[in-house]
Amino acid sequence: MELAEIRNTAEWMEKKLDEYKASLDLETKISRIEELENEMTYPDFWNNQESAQKVIDESNGLKAMVDKYQHLADGHENIVLTYELIKEEPDVELQEELESELGDIKKKFDEFELQILLNGEYDANNAILELHPGAGGTESQDWASMLLRMYQRFCDKQGWKVETMDYQPGDEAGVKSVTLRIQGHNAYGYLKAEKGIHRLVRISPFDSSGRRHTSFVSCDVMPEFNDDIDIEIRTEDLRVDTYRASGAGGQHINTTDSAVRITHVPTGVVVSCQQERSQIKNREAAMKMLKAKLYQREIEEKQKKLDEIRGEKSDIAWGSQIRSYVFHPYSMVKDHRTNYEVGNTQGAMDGDIMGFIDAYLRLMNM
């Protein structure tokens, strides 16, 4: 790499840092961190643990953003200083180190830019993720369990906490449906990219003839809302059923009817929760999920009306998959919205899906 190229890269970084500083309004974020840290010193801070956790999560998210910006600024400063040294007194070894450092920090700039793209109203929220197999019985239910593992691995890599709110085991293998609550800064902002139909093509382990099968699973993702979201839910519109909770493999995980299923009769929206041992707590959690689903439904209906006005039509049939995972006759995972693809299917199934999410978020912000 020529010195002129190093200088151009350093100038590009300086320009990017100025853009980031303006768009992020860093001074306001730093002031907000101070407010939150002051709030944490109140004697009654932990009286409401849920409220306290929200304050901590907001503070951690803001700190992470400010710290990452500062890390990039420090890296840029170091590159400029090293460049000036080499320009005055050429040093091959030092220049090679600088070139390597440039590659690393440029990658960090790309990662930081992705985080800035998460500027939606609810992107910072926790996420509720649901998986529902399509037709195909055991095949699709097994595919749902594979996707469940993939998302659990992905969330682990992000340092997010995953709770299984509802789990309906498959008849022979896999799952009939599963609902996860994912706690972490920007969980919804990232995972919204996964909403849609996921298609698998493979040689079936359940087919003695070794034939190739295609399976589908629907992934739904919603933001988890705080209590301040304005959604009217009338008690008379709800049907509440209780049942005995089941764990993976079909075993009962509770000896009482603590699991709760709530049906919103006017819309037919159904939510279930069996995470807690207490029926009251399961009902509270289910009501949060219902609120999220009804809000999401309201947004989608508004979007549908806008699409009709514009003459657009969204196809939500099983054929409109967002991503295909092909295990046979070749190995490839391809996102049909962005055309981003990888040949390492095992890596994707182990949770390495940030590349797909990155490509989708960049496409949506073009």
Curated annotation (Swiss-Prot):
InterPro entries: PCRF, Pep_chain_release_fac_I, Pep_chain_release_fac_I_sf, PrfB. GO terms for molecular function: translation release factor activity, codon specific. Transmembrane segments: none annotated. Methylated by PrmC. Methylation increases the termination efficiency of RF2. It holds the Pfam family PCRF. Keywords: Cytoplasm, Methylation, Protein biosynthesis. It comes from the Bacteria. It is found in: Cytoplasm. GO terms for cellular component: cytoplasm. SUPFAM superfamilies: Release factor. The keyword Cytoplasm applies. The modification N5-methylglutamine is found at Q251. Belongs to the prokaryotic/mitochondrial release factor family. PANTHER family: CLASS I PEPTIDE CHAIN RELEASE FACTOR (PTHR43116:SF3), PEPTIDE CHAIN RELEASE FACTOR 2 (PTHR43116). Peptide chain release factor 2 directs the termination of translation in response to the peptide chain termination codons UGA and UAA. This is Peptide chain release factor 2. It comes from Exiguobacterium sibiricum (strain DSM 17290 / CCUG 55495 / CIP 109462 / JCM 13490 / 255-15).
